[in-house]
Structures are given as structure tokens and as C-alpha cells.
């Protein structure tokens, strides 16, 4: 007997509020979940073996953005965001023997999971001194949490032997930040200039990278 199961789901949603003549608020989200698995069951006389194999992954993003008009020439966007990614896969095998003294079940399973969690904030400014000159500048800070991967192994041979252990690297935390500025200007009808700068840094377990 074979029982496949699958599920694919994606959701995009966005709502916005007008708080006044100069302020708007936007809330957006993306939710994705894909799940696939197969279960089998076989009977051989007094023995029954069952196999369960599956994998799933999830993406989730939530963002809140505030748009503010400081003046006719200056606008800003402040964004707060949170995201999540998960990946899981597993294999589970069990063998059951029917005996006069009762059922005896042996089991072997291997489960693996990994993931990433992000939370951060960003601010961007758009400044337009005139219709031939456009300046952008801002910055961003994001906190990352990495789950590099963990494997759980389960061995169950009744009273003879049992094992349930998890193997994997520890979680890793890092902070990423950057600031930028960009200046775009029309010098004349034939020439245009676009100059700017970007500085970024990464903090990982007490070490700084720039």
C-alpha cells in the first residue's frame, strides 16, 4: 500500500493605511509552505513493515513600512521586517512482528532540519532638489540566526538496544549593517552623472568583517 501526500501553498497579501496627508503605512506578507511525503505499508505473513519518507520547506516574510513626506522635496521610508526559512526531511522505517507473546516492533528513523531567522530595520531617504537632481541615502541593520542543520537518529530495538541522539553544529548568530548614498544629476542634455558610496560591515561571533 502506497499513500503519497503533497501540499503546495503560497500566499501574498498587502494592506495600506493613509494616516494623513503626509503619512502612509504598508503591511505586506508572503507565506510559502511546500510539503511532500510518501507512506508505504507491506505485510509479509506475520510481519508488517512501514516506511514514511518526507520533506518540507517553509518561507515566511513580514514587513511593515512607514512612508513620510517631510517636504515637497524630501521623502523617507522606514521598514521593519522579519523572515523565516525552514527545511526538514526525514526517513522513518518500522518493522512489526506478530508473536504469541505480543507485537515486537523495531524502528529506525533519521530526521534532518535547518533554518534561518532574520529580523531587521531599514531607512531610506529620497531627496529631489530639482527635476534634474536626485539623491538617495539610508541604512539597514539585520540580525541573522542560522540553524546550520541538525540530524536526529532514532534506533529502537525493543529491550535489546535503544538510541535517540541529535548531531549537528550549534546555532550561529550574526549582525549585518550598511549605509549608502547615491547622487544622480543631469549635467546637461547629453551628460548625466551617477556617483555614490556604500559601506557595509558584518559581525559574526565577535569577529568584524568590513
Language-model-detected regions and their locations in the chain:
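Outer-membrane beta-barrel translocator/receptor signature
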Residues: 1-13, 19-23
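Outer-membrane beta-barrel translocator/channel fold
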Residues: 2, 35-38
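Face-selective signature of the C-terminal outer-membrane beta-barrel domain
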Residues: 16-34, 56-209
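Non-catalytic, glycine-rich low-complexity segments
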Residues: 52-54
Amino acid at each position: 500500500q502506497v499513500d503519497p501526500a503533497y501540499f503546495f501553498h503560497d500566499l501574498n497579501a498587502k494592506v495600506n493605511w493613509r494616516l494623513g496627508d503626509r503619512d502612509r503605512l504598508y503591511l505586506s506578507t508572503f507565506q510559502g509552505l511546500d510539503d511532500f511525503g510518501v507512506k508505504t505499508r507491506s505485510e509479509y505473513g506475520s510481519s508488517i513493515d512501514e516506511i514514511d519518507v518526507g520533506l518540507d520547506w517553509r518561507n515566511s516574510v513580514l514587513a511593515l513600512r512607514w512612508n513620510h513626506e517631510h517636504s515637497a522635496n524630501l521623502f523617507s521610508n522606514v521598514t521593519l521586517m522579519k523572515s523565516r526559512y525552514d527545511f526538514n526531511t526525514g526517513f522513518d522505517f518500522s518493522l512489526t512482528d506478530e508473536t504469541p507473546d505480543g507485537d515486537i516492533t523495531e524502528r529506525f528513523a533519521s530526521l534532518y532540519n535547518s533554518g534561518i531567522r532574520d529580523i531587521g530595520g531599514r531607512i531610506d531617504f529620497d531627496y529631489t532638489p530639482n527635476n534634474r537632481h536626485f539623491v538617495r541615502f539610508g541604512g539597514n541593520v539585520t540580525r541573522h540566526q542560522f540553524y546550520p542543520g541538525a540530524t536526529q537518529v532514532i534506533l529502537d530495538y525493543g529491550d535489546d538496544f535503544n538510541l535517540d541522539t541529535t548531531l549537528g553544529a550549534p546555532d550561529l548568530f550574526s549582525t549585518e549593517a550598511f549605509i549608502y548614498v547615491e547622487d544622480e544629476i543631469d549635467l546637461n542634455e547629453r551628460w548625466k552623472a551617477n556617483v555614490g558610496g556604500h559601506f557595509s560591515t558584518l559581525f559574526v561571533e565577535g569577529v568584524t568583517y568590513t
